Structure formats: structure tokens, C-alpha cells
UniProtKB/Swiss-Prot annotation:
One of its GO terms (molecular function) is DNA binding. DNA-binding protein that binds to both single- and double-stranded DNA. Binds preferentially to UV-damaged DNA. May be involved in DNA-metabolic processes. WD repeats lie at residues 185-226, 249-289, 296-336, 341-381, 388-427, 450-493, 496-527. One of its GO terms (cellular component) is nuclear periphery. PANTHER family: WD REPEAT-CONTAINING PROTEIN 76. Belongs to the WD repeat DDB2/WDR76 family. This is DNA damage-binding protein cmr1. Residues 52-62 have a biased composition (Basic residues).
């Protein structure tokens, strides 16, 4: 009996599939007939006694006064070409190649110097004077708005200095002038951000995946008329957005940016279009400072850094695993030095600020490596030491105390303290064993960003106003986390209006300002 029922259900499903197929074929036939692709077949009596469908009247032609002169697409049949003819194939190949060339042209870097008007995408005109001023979670699962650190953790803190810093950092509040979902700084996903070093006002730069550069002066205030009307629902459309400026100095992703503290009128930006450009904030012009000799050379740059005591030398890494150095005062051919440090991409790197001949790299090959430029061979470069993680390492950030913070896809933040190991006194050729390269602190942190969220990277505050070093990093639960160099969490910054993960988190170098950028090009600012 059970077998008969099974057969009956199967038969019902088979008949349903046949009926669905017939209905689809009938619809396609009617659509083709109405489009005039072929005449309707002669009517045949149907088993169900259905009446013959009436032929739709041909639409009346309306004579146009002025015919459009735009070229119209025509099929091979109308052009008299056989479907499989060599002419048709050649024509299709030519069209495909033309489309590919147009797409490649969009991505080729532009080596020219740009004026403000040539870079401007949207927003107000930049003025140099006004711009610069006178002066742990479940692995791989994001739980939006669920806190992992809060007031209770602060109350339980017994160390007075740590408790005071936790209260200070947790006391930062979102910029009140506009909600984060109103501050769209770039058209596409934010990949990198930085603050201008000025303490007079928060000036924020953000680079996105298409080469756009957004500029926000967060000292601006909402117009008085808008403040008065904010309770009036009818006046909601009249509430102005913040004043922003969007430029386009690059043709591909802006991967990293840097403002040297002794050269505050210049912003350096590195890009996947293989170039490093210098934006003069006073003249509002952009010039190329470094790029391969040929525009056809595709060497995407993944990071940029500069030594605090040298405003003229650029350091960078590439997605091909190379490390480069260039003194901008010398001729390009003689001054550029490169080393191949990894077979896979270097996702992030940084110099040791007080001893910049040391630098750290994070790679897709799962390593964090420490290097010494004084003892770096071009043929077979050997690191001071390396530590291998279970999965790829996204970034390695050095602070002024000789500590390195890394983020990794094994859902950890690792902190390495080389300052306590005497890094400042190491001679050229000094090496570390595997045991000496082990991290001093490991913090659980969800780093599973997926495809649409920018990779999480730790960033230290360059000159903190207390002895405790601290860094910030995005949190997949739509917060920005702040940690000390010992791995203690200092704050978990959030607020209303944050509708996406502020994955790109940055500290101001000396003031407790923190900004976070999202995949929609919007930013959050805590002060």
C-alpha cells in the first residue's frame, strides 16, 4: 500500500512538471508571435475544447516628426550575415575587444599632475587656509549591536590607572552634528582613512575602492535654521547634509594614506593603480611621486609609511610581496630600491617609528615578519624573525614603544613586545628564535569580514597623552574596539545611526579622536 502511495505521489509530481513545461512553452510561443518573430501556427483543436486565441491587432505606426539619428542595434539576420559566418564571428570579436579596451583604459593610472577641478567629483572647493587651519565574539558570526565590553567591565577594574583610561576612552561620544548615516564621505567602500595631524580641528581623509578621496572638516556646525527645524517633520527635506569634498586622484583602490607631521600640507596616497601621489592641500593639486616606469606595469601598492624624522623618503609594499623605498629628492631610476620579501601578497606593514630601519610585514602566507633594512639582501632577504599564524595575517602595526599589533583570519589580535627585548639596541644582523618571536598577548576578535567588508586592521595612536599605549580596530558587531598594549580592552564605541560595520578604524595621532569607515562610504566620528 505504501508503494502505491509513493508511486501516486511521484505520478502527480510528474504530471505537474509536464503541465508547467507546457504552460511555459505556450507563453514563449505567444511572446514570440506578438514580437513578430514567426507567424502563428494554424489552430488545432485542443483536448480541452479551448477556443482559438484571437490574433492581436498589429500596433498602429505613429509617424515621427524627427527620426532619431542614434545608431540602432541590428541582428546578424537583418544585416544579411549567416549565424556561423566568419564575418559575424569577426564582428563579435571586435565588439568584445573594444569593450575590454574601454574597461582597461578606465583602470590605467594617470601619471599627469591634476588640478583641483580635474580631480573634483563632488562637494565644495577646497581652500588651503580653511582646510588646514591656522595651526571577544563567536568565531565568524557577527551579532549587530551586541556588546562584549561595557560599564560593568569598567566598574570591576581594580587598577586605578587602567580604570581612569577606560572611563576616558569609553566617554568618547559620536559627533552630534549629523548622524553617521548622513555622512557619506566616499561614493564606494572605504578602504583606508587617516586624520590630519592638526589638533585644532578634526580633518578626516578617506579613500575608497574606486580611487575616490573624501575630505571632511568635522569642525563645521549644522546651520542654525536646520537646528531650529529638526523637530519639524515637514522640514526634514530641508535639513542640509554636512559639507564634504570628493576628489578622484587615482583610478583604482586607494589602499593607504599618510600625512607626515613635519609636512602637514601634503597628503600621500598609495593605490592599486601602482602609484603613490602627493596631494598639496594648500594648492589643491595632485602630482605623482612614484610609479613603475611604464603605465602597463601592474604592481598594486598595498601600504605606505614614512619615518617620523624623514619627510622625503617613501616606503611601500605591494600585493606581489615586494617592499620598496624611494627618496623623492633624487632621480627616480637611481633612488628606487626594492626587495622581494614574500611569494604572496603583503597586506600591511609599518616602520618602527623611533628606529625606522626596523619594519614589520603581514602576509597572506600566514606570517608576521620583522626586518632590518640595514641587513637586507636584495638576492635572499632574511628577516630578523618571523611568526606563523594558523591563517593569513592582515596587518602588522608598530608603535613607538617597539610593540607590534597584528590582526589575523584566525580570529585573533596578537601583540608582540620587542621593546622589552631591547630592539632599540640591536645591531645589524641580530636575529630572533621562533620562541622569541611568539606573541606576548593574544586577544580573541572576530576578523571574518567576508567579501563586502574591508579587512580589519589595528592602528595605534602615534603619540598618546599617557604612558599606556592603545590601538583601535573595527568590530563586526558595528562598534570600534580600543585595546591597550597589554590586551586590556579600554572601550567599545558605538551609537545610534551606525547601520554598517565601521571596519576601517583610525586614531588621531595625539588627540582622542577616533573615526570609523564603512562599506557604504559613510563614517562615524567619536570625540
Amino acid at each position: 500500500m505504501g508503494a502505491d502511495n509513493e508511486l501516486s505521489e511521484f505520478e502527480k509530481q510528474r504530471l505537474a512538471n509536464i503541465a508547467e513545461r507546457d504552460a511555459l512553452l505556450k507563453k514563449l510561443t505567444l511572446d514570440a508571435q506578438s514580437a513578430g518573430l514567426f507567424p502563428p501556427k494554424s489552430a488545432r483543436s485542443s483536448p480541452g475544447g479551448l477556443t482559438k486565441p484571437k490574433k492581436k491587432p498589429a500596433p498602429k505606426k505613429v509617424k515621427k516628426e524627427d527620426e532619431d539619428l542614434v545608431p540602432r542595434r541590428m541582428s546578424s539576420r537583418l544585416r544579411g550575415l549567416a549565424a556561423d559566418s566568419e564575418v559575424a564571428k569577426r564582428k563579435a570579436d571586435e565588439q568584445y575587444e573594444a569593450a575590454q579596451q574601454a574597461e582597461r583604459a578606465k583602470r590605467v593610472r594617470k601619471s599627469d599632475a591634476f588640478s583641483f577641478s580635474e580631480m573634483l567629483v563632488s562637494g565644495q572647493k577646497l581652500s588651503g587656509d580653511s582646510l588646514i587651519g591656522v595651526d571577544v565574539v563567536t568565531k565568524g558570526v557577527a551579532m549587530p549591536y551586541q556588546r562584549t565590553f561595557g560599564d560593568d567591565d569598567i566598574k570591576k577594574t581594580t587598577d586605578k590607572e587602567l580604570k581612569a583610561l577606560r572611563e576616558e576612552m569609553s566617554g568618547l561620544r559620536l559627533w552630534e552634528a549629523w548622524e553617521p548615516n548622513r555622512i557619506k564621505l566616499t561614493p564606494e567602500r572605504i578602504y583606508t582613512m587617516t586624520f590630519h595631524p592638526s589638533e585644532a580641528k578634526p580633518l578626516i581623509f578617506a579613500g575608497d575602492k574606486m580611487g575616490n578621496l573624501g575630505v571632511l572638516d568635522a569642525s563645521q556646525e549644522k546651520p542654525i535654521s536646520a537646528v531650529k527645524q529638526e523637530d519639524d517633520e515637514d522640514a526634514e527635506d530641508d535639513d542640509p547634509d554636512p559639507v564634504l569634498t570628493t576628489l578622484k586622484p587615482h583610478t583604482r583602490t586607494i589602499s593607504s594614506m599618510h600625512v607626515h607631521p613635519s609636512k602637514p600640507t601634503h597628503l600621500y596616497s598609495a593605490s592599486y593603480d601602482s602609484s603613490i601621489r602627493e596631494l598639496d592641500l594648500e594648492k589643491t593639486t595632485s602630482v605623482e611621486k612614484y610609479a613603475p616606469e611604464s603605465t602597463s606595469d601592474d604592481i598594486p601598492i598595498s601600504g605606505i609609511d614614512m619615518a617620523p624624522d624623514d619627510p622625503n623618503t617613501l616606503y611601500w609594499t605591494t600585493l606581489d610581496g615586494a617592499f620598496g623605498r624611494y627618496d623623492t629628492r633624487a632621480s627616480r631610476r637611481s633612488a628606487v630600491a626594492t626587495w622581494q620579501l614574500s611569494e604572496k601578497k603583503i597586506g600591511g606593514f609599518s616602520l618602527f617609528p623611533t628606529h625606522p630601519h626596523f619594519f614589520a610585514t603581514a602576509s597572506l602566507d600566514r606570517t608576521m615578519r620583522l626586518w632590518d633594512i640595514r641587513k637586507l639582501s636584495h638576492d635572499e632577504p632574511v628577516p630578523v624573525g618571523e611568526h606563523v599564524s594558523r591563517l593569513s595575517v592582515s596587518h602588522a602595526a608598530f608603535n613607538s614603544a617597539g610593540q607590534i599589533a597584528t590582526s589575523s583570519y584566525d580570529d585573533t589580535l596578537k601583540i608582540y613586545d620587542f621593546g622589552s627585548k631591547g630592539i632599540a639596541a640591536w645591531k645589524p644582523g641580530h636575529t630572533l628564535s621562533d620562541a622569541e618571536m611568539k606573541p606576548d598577548t593574544i586577544v580573541r576578535h572576530n576578523c571574518q569580514t567576508g567579501r563586502w567588508v574591508t579587512i580589519l586592521r589595528p592602528q595605534w595612536q602615534a603619540n598618546p597623552q599617557s604612558p599606556i599605549q592603545r590601538f583601535c580596530i573595527g568590530n563586526m558587531n558595528r562598534f570600534v574596539d580600543v585595546y591597550s598594549s597589554s590586551g586590556d580592552q579600554l572601550a567599545q564605541l558605538g551609537g545610534d545611526g551606525i547601520t554598517a560595520v565601521p571596519a576601517v578604524a583610525v586614531f588621531h595621532r595625539s588627540t582622542n579622536w577616533i573615526a570609523g569607515g564603512t562599506a557604504s562610504g559613510k563614517i562615524c566620528l567619536w570625540m
